[in-house]
Amino acid sequence: MNTVKQSNMISSFSKYFLLTLMGTQLMGQSNTPTRFALKTVIQDTFLTEGLSSNIVAEIRTLGDSLTWLGTGQGLALHDGHRIFAYQTSADSLKDGQFTKLVPQGGIPAIAVMGDTMAVAYSGDNGNIQVGYGVTLTYDAQDTSGITWTYLKQPVDNVADTLKPFGEGYYRQLPVTVPEANVTYDADLSGDFLWTASWAGGLRRYHLTKRAWENVPMPMDGQDSLSLCEGFDETTSDGKSVLPGYYLNPRDPGDGGNHNHKAFSVIAYGDTVWVGTANGVNKGIMIFEVNEVSPGIFEILNCIEWEHYSYPDDGLAGNFVVGLAKQLWNGQITIWAASLYADKPGESRGLSYTRDDGVTWNTTLLNERVYNVTTKDSLVFASTSSGLWKSHDGENWAKYSAAIDTAFLAHQQILTDLVYTSSLDERDTIPKLWIGTSDGVALSSDIHGASWSIFQTEYDTTEVYAYPNPFSPLSHNQLNGDGYVRFHTGEVYNTEIILDIFNFAMEKVYSENFNLNKFRGAVKWNGRGQTGALVSNGVYFARINFAYSANNSPKDFWTKIIVVK
């Protein structure tokens, strides 16, 4: 059986994304519009208030007030009041099946066009990421319950070695399994849902014909590819074939092409841009109907590709994990989040072109960029060090980590890392969403002055520490420290006293949180009073506060396991 061989690049990325799509998540209140109202029966049947994962990697606004969230453990939405998790189906869904529930899995991609929405799902088999398919709806604002069409992860048949596209046929290695075939990005434009599925390559789904097709792109050594002409080889049964072309997403050392590993995609009008493990591809879709003689018409339906890569075209790095289109003053800028691939001299950062790919520039070098969001002159870059904003693409300012400044809120995003951002312009004053590994936050303006934060609450009334076990070297990394958070529930006085004891009940740390002044999470960075990290072991936290208006402050105890 011909299948795609797992490569080192696939392995390393799958490990990263597995960590990305696992975690804990999310609940809260917001002041966004209230025009959308979920019916109670829908809440009870298909939605559960709060979320199951703090990891939020996708944010899409839709209609007057809906905001859809792609989390590490499923699909979620904010309806203008509260956050809900979409319930999942434990049963295996069939290709083309209508369903009110969605598949289990993390959400690597959400695409929206009007009321049409597509959501991709993924998981793992213990060794590698696996594509769980896509759900598609044409009425994403249906308050009586959305009807989804489930599309299984597209794969090829073993015999699919010669496929039609454009003005002829091309040869390919069939991708027959969902392993490493994960839809990491998707976009809706015109008649098509475009998907970038790594080993599954670039594919598009015709929304009317309800059919998938593979979309061939240039091989690694090609700077262009025409699917409109050049099909000069003829098979024994008369098919016109592209000579010397082979679609193969294996590694180059195994006969394949990094440029056939699609990871990011945007489409608009007659143009599609695709980021791969070997740069950026620009496709111009040609559709012409010409009358070649009276009553005889010739239809031309194809794509002309241009391929840009490091070092020849000036990209920062060839592994392009995110793409965005900016339209400002009549000029289109294409932004590409670039990582190292396999060529010496590559760097992380942003690559961009303002002249349709003719020339490329770089900025934010050495930053690990996940996603880019644009609006008019504004560019937002979501990175491992935080959210950056620019008005010109050259000068950048970084937001401080999100903190809820409301009195007694004591909520905070305890991570530098921002996976994604989204501008919400549906009210008079635009708002800003960010998705992180520690929840999702909504700013009341684009400046980040005041945040509402939504995070998982496992038990709203219990006192507990999380994550637990806790590693100060890897968990909740913020400004050089790692943190464990203490959940207290409602606090009815203005002081919280935190004491940390080792297993011998010797006090190693103490802090008083004056809630009249302090804003942020009740937390500990795993350090003792001297500033040094404590040793591995079991620790006990004593937290003193008043849990109701009619009670004096009292001590609450919880246990923490520190493992560096």
Task: Cite the ranges covered by each PLM segment.
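Short, glycine-anchored, charge-dense loop/turn motifs used at functional sites
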Residues: 496-508, 539
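A short loop-to-beta-strand structural motif that recurs across blades of beta-propeller domains
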Residues: 74-76, 130-136, 201-203, 279-282, ...
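C-terminal tail/sorting-segment detector
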Residues: 540-564
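Surface-exposed loop and turn segments in beta-propeller and other repeat-based domains
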Residues: 44-48, 87-101, 146-177, 215-255, ...
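Conserved beta-propeller blade signature
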Residues: 66-69, 117-119, 192-195, 271-274, ...
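Glycine-centered coil/turn sites that cap beta-strands in beta-rich domains
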Residues: 459-499, 524, 549-551
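Blade-level signature of beta-propeller repeat domains, shared across WD40, Kelch, NHL, RCC1
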Residues: 416-462, 471
